[in-house]
Amino acid sequence: MSCIFAFSKDRPPALIHDGYSETIDRKALQSYLRGACLLDPFYSACVNGHAEGLWRMRDLAPDAFYESEFAWSSEVHPCISDQAGTLIEEIGYIVPLGLGEAATFSLMRNRNSSPFSVEEFTNLEVLAPIVSASIQQHYNAINTARGGGKQHRSNADAVFSKAFGELTQAQYAVTKLILSGHSNISIASILEIAEGTVKMHRYNIYKRLNISSQAELFQLFIEQLTD
C-alpha cells in the first residue's frame, strides 16, 4: 500500500494520493485526517522541518511509539484497520513543499509481507530526487484548488485542544508527548525538566481528566475525532 499526505501546522492535512487497499476502513482514514495525524511520526517530521529523503518510520518515531495506543489503533490508524492486520513496516519519502509544508510518500507492508530489506531500501533511496521532484510538481499543480498560499488553520490542533483544553499549558504539552509515544524519560529530555516532574504532571493530568490510564487518555482524544 502507499499514500501521499501534505502536512502543515497551518493548513489541514491533504491526502494527495490514495493508494490504500479496498479493505481500509474509511472512517479510520477520516479520523486520521481530522486530528489523529498529530500523533504520526511522519506528520511530526514534516511540520518540524526534518531532513528530506527516504526514512524508516522506526528511525523517526519516539522511543515508546510502538507501545502507544495510536500505533495499534484500528479506529484512527488507516493501515491497522486493513483486514490484513498490523503493519510490519512503513517507510516514507519526506518532500519539502515550501511555506512550512512538506509531503510524505509512505510505502507500507503488512504482516503478510516482510520488512523492506537493506537492498530494497537502498534502491528506493536512490530514487529520492526523482520522487521529490515529481511530488513537488504534482502538488504545485493541485495547490490552486486547495487555496494556493492562503493559510487555513488546521482543525487537527483544534480537536486536540477541545479534548484537553482544560489542562494547564505544561500539562497540555506533556499530554501531547505522551500520546505521540514518548516515554517519561524522553518527555523530560524534550521539555528539559526532571523525570519526576513528568510523572507528577502525568498524575495531575489523569486526576484532572478523571481517568487512571494512558489508554483512557487516548480514548478521550478518539472521542473528539468521532463526534
Locations of regions flagged by a protein language model:
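Regulatory input/activation interfaces that engage signals or partners
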Residues: 1-98, 107-110, 129
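Regulatory loop-to-helix N-cap segments in sensory/regulatory domains
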Residues: 109-124
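Pre-recognition alpha-helix immediately N-terminal to the DNA-recognition helix
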Residues: 172-173, 216
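Regulatory hinge/linker segments at domain boundaries
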Residues: 144-170
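Recognition helix of helix-turn-helix DNA-binding domains
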Residues: 181-216
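Short helix-to-turn junction characteristic of helix-turn-helix DNA-binding domains
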Residues: 178-182, 221
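Allosteric cytosolic regulatory segments
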Residues: 125-132
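Short, basic, alpha-helical segments at the C-terminal edge of helix-turn-helix-like DNA-binding modules
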Residues: 214-226
